[in-house]
Amino acid sequence: MKRILIVTGQSGSGKSSALQVLEDLGYYCIDNLPLALLPEIVAKLDHENNLEQLALGVDVRSTRADMQEFDLVFEQLQKHGTVDVIYLTTQDQELIARFSASRRPHPLASRFKSLNECIQEEKQLLLPIQFRSTVHIDTTDKSVHDLKHTLLSKLGQSDKLILILQSFGYKHGIPLDADYVFDVRHLPNPHWDLELRRFSGLDEPVRRFLESSDQTNEMFDDIFHFLDKWLPVFAEGHRHYMTVSIGCTGGQHRSVYIVDRLKKALEAKWSIQVLHREMKHWS
């Protein structure tokens, strides 16, 4: 296991939201386990699973004795990877407002304590973990999206949208998972040239044939400029994946060529995955 994150902090500061962000980034997330059980669980996961990123949510519901033993737990976890502690905090008045708005009780609530007293007690209980924190985030004025971008910055993670470029053949059906579909069946078809039929859109003879057509170049330019303009907007909308499908008749020549050319034009800016759906049908 390469990286272990312990996510903790004051109740109401956004631990659940932070774990959701980390899950979206590919972390295997576990929440609300007692501190004393963490070394055993992590050792088991490290032995039985090929996990590279693990995030553990810890809160004040662990016992006082567990909290005092945090240094020992931390050292045991270090045997399995690099350990960072993300500590979330929020100003008292904002926490009170959040609990009032949600109408949920504080984990330390009782009929003998005010909400403010619960908040102060929790701060003291969490001190052993706070002293170990390597990432400290004040969420007082942060939305969930703000928290996401702060986490990405603090952890050195990329928030790049993953662009999936897919070629397909209309005769095999339109992909159901496509966000956008572009039809390139009007372009010159290498299939009707017997010398080109056996090749795919990845091969140089087909590339030369298609690039000799003004229509091909104009179609590519239009698709490229559309994606180049709008992908940043989609990414700002907090999308993690975008699937763009390019279709020709059989999914071997024209669509494959356009997908390959788009990949080369866009890969400097975006994380790209390529799928040639009809490859098994290529002659």
Curated annotation (Swiss-Prot):
Which sites bind GTP? D59, V60, R61, S62
Q: Does the keyword GTP-binding apply?
A: yes
**One Pfam short name:** RapZ-like_N
Q: Check the record and name the InterPro entries matching this protein.
A: P-loop_NTPase, RapZ-like, RapZ-like_N, RapZ_C
Positions of ATP binding: G9, Q10, S11, G12, S13, G14, K15, S16
Among its keywords, does the record have ATP-binding?
A: yes
A GO molecular-function term, please?
ATP binding
Annotated keywords? ATP-binding, GTP-binding, Nucleotide-binding
Gene3D superfamilies from the UniProt entry: P-loop containing nucleotide triphosphate hydrolases
- Please list which residues make up the signal peptide: none
Q: Which domain of life is it from?
A: Bacteria
What family is reported?
Belongs to the RapZ-like family.
Purpose of the protein: Displays ATPase and GTPase activities.
What protein name does the entry list? Nucleotide-binding protein ACIAD3059
What organism does this protein naturally occur in?
Acinetobacter baylyi (strain ATCC 33305 / BD413 / ADP1)
Traced from the root, the source organism's taxonomic lineage reads:
Bacteria, Pseudomonadati, Pseudomonadota, Gammaproteobacteria, Moraxellales
